[in-house]
Amino acid sequence: HLSALCAQTQTAGRGRAEHTWVTPPHGALTVSVVLRPVVPAARLDWLPLLAGLAVQRTLEPRLEGTGWRARTKWPNDVVVLPTDAPADASAVDAPGWGLSRKVAGILCELIPASERIENSGAAGPAGRRGGLERARAEASAVIVGIGVNLAQGAAELPVPWAASLAGLGVDSELTVVRGVLEDLGRHLAELVASWEDRDGDPDGGDGELGRCLREACSTLGQDVVVTTPAGLVRGRAIDVRPGLVLRDAVGGPAGEDGAEEFVISAGDVASARLGTPTGT
């Protein structure tokens, strides 16, 4: 639990939907973290958003004074947005991304245990206190892959809507892989522990974890178009549960047009104003 493998460079990086990329030596943080969260398996889908929040909290202080702020983007990205809107927004709009630029991506891969945690008798708070290590040993593992653009130049970035901390004006001392990894590990450990304390429900207890997840998510409150396995769905993004909740959804499976609320479990999100996603 919380062990990590960090690569100095990647030549065949793999993302969601089998997207691939390369990273130059020392240009990015590319790390895989093993987690064995003691939560019901049905709540593991919160992990990409939790990992994204850990990345956002790692990057936000580094961006201070640059004119950019870090936010998560459902389902598995971290982006930066300008703190002040430019005079001519159309000049910097990126198709499907608007004014935002992608600085990090996350991929979570489940490795099921022989005995799932919900069958171990230790998923509740009392069970965790009485046998946390046993419960963790029996829990499914999740490999959380995280890539953060740190020091790449513009020509080294894979797509026009990507950015690196160096390119955003972050001081080089704050883009050192080891320092970023240490801060990321601390935030991730704290968030996973808080999530476990709530039995995998971010809205449990005082609801603070759920509020933090939503406040960090740039997707919420936006009119979006989502490319899903069932087709395009348009609507206003109003919540994460952890699927993306759209209001006044149009599209998707037959019979869902005009649904007051429609929950999407997987898909690529773009601004409805700018059109369909071009990939991640």
Task: Cite the ranges covered by each PLM segment.
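N-terminal lobe of the biotin/lipoate ligase/transferase fold
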Residues: H1-E64, V79-G105, E115-L132, L174, ...
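A short glycine-rich, hydrophobically flanked beta-strand micro-motif that places a catalytic Asp/Glu
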Residues: W68-V78
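Short, conserved beta-turn/loop elements at beta-strand boundaries and strand-helix junctions
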Residues: I111-E115, G153, V240-V245
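Conserved, helical-rich catalytic subdomain that frames metal- and/or nucleotide-binding sites
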Residues: L168-A230, G275-G279
